[in-house]
């Protein structure tokens, strides 16, 4: 049996009596007592997540921009100012998604990506292979000397500034998907990015691993509530944000996973997977579902792999949960083309075909329900 990996905050989670689970080979907190309360803290105040299992990778060299023009489906030509970030998929030649990631621009000779925990080794091997085979001459450096804390919620930024006062000057004017470096803090040099995976405002903070426990404790002292992977999943689902390995994978095109907006075909770039995407186009629609209630009560819970029956044929749920914010059972589903918001479909739950409404994603953003 392979031993689970630990983040630098592992002992802290144990001390907080977190319930730990195996997540992509990492021993991670699923909750610290009440997943619902952690979810609500992020929607109404501020919560924080240890996402140090994700991997920071630095890319340096003269041809780093050309490398990412080749590697990513989104266009790094959009990255022109230091700290600007871009969400993209990494595709294989068949147009399937190797991973989804965020890439940061720090200079013409320095880009940084943050990749998912379960795919980090695969991604780094793929990056190295492309670098070697196509002669980009880059230095590619995984940075396991860094940890990441995501602080999310309507009061998240103020509580970060209360914890690290001179981070305010560097980060107050940041727009979403921008980052700033903050030097000489009690927690070392921080990279503070206005990004997240919850549908709320906040920061994702890259911090030297040696200082992350002190930062975590200082944030908690300011009233930021620790939150686990359980709340992270219900929050991202409400926010209409995909999870790699569930909503897309090596065999699924971004065009069939609600991620067409991350594919830039406007520029004459021969990114890997482009030819296949252009040849095949989109074959399915990616939609939200809300299960109808039975006499005002939840009729069931929508879960991954349940069959969805539509007038146009069958589809499948990719992610599902009970939404604490909406008090509804919600899901993402991949369904035949032609299924539209407002349609009613039927989901096979055990031996019943239960009705569900098709909606446009997301369900919730910035604490507000957008559907229903």
Curated annotation (Swiss-Prot):
<protein>
    <recommendedName>
        <fullName>Aminomethyltransferase</fullName>
        <ecNumber>2.1.2.10</ecNumber>
    </recommendedName>
</protein>
<dbReference type="GO" id="GO:0005829">
    <property type="term" value="C:cytosol"/>
</dbReference>
<dbReference type="GO" id="GO:0005960">
    <property type="term" value="C:glycine cleavage complex"/>
</dbReference>
<dbReference type="Pfam" id="PF01571">
    <property type="entry name" value="GCV_T"/>
</dbReference>
<dbReference type="InterPro" id="IPR027266">
    <property type="entry name" value="TrmE/GcvT_dom1"/>
</dbReference>
<dbReference type="InterPro" id="IPR028896">
    <property type="entry name" value="GcvT/YgfZ/DmdA"/>
</dbReference>
<dbReference type="InterPro" id="IPR006222">
    <property type="entry name" value="GCV_T_N"/>
</dbReference>
<dbReference type="InterPro" id="IPR013977">
    <property type="entry name" value="GCST_C"/>
</dbReference>
<dbReference type="GO" id="GO:0008483">
    <property type="term" value="F:transaminase activity"/>
</dbReference>
<comment type="function">
    <text>The glycine cleavage system catalyzes the degradation of glycine.</text>
</comment>
<dbReference type="InterPro" id="IPR006223">
    <property type="entry name" value="GCS_T"/>
</dbReference>
<keyword id="KW-0808">Transferase</keyword>
<keyword id="KW-0032">Aminotransferase</keyword>
<dbReference type="Pfam" id="PF08669">
    <property type="entry name" value="GCV_T_C"/>
</dbReference>
<dbReference type="GO" id="GO:0004047">
    <property type="term" value="F:aminomethyltransferase activity"/>
</dbReference>
<comment type="similarity">
    <text>Belongs to the GcvT family.</text>
</comment>
<dbReference type="GO" id="GO:0019464">
    <property type="term" value="P:glycine decarboxylation via glycine cleavage system"/>
</dbReference>
<dbReference type="InterPro" id="IPR022903">
    <property type="entry name" value="GCS_T_bac"/>
</dbReference>
<comment type="subunit">
    <text>The glycine cleavage system is composed of four proteins: P, T, L and H.</text>
</comment>
<dbReference type="InterPro" id="IPR029043">
    <property type="entry name" value="GcvT/YgfZ_C"/>
</dbReference>
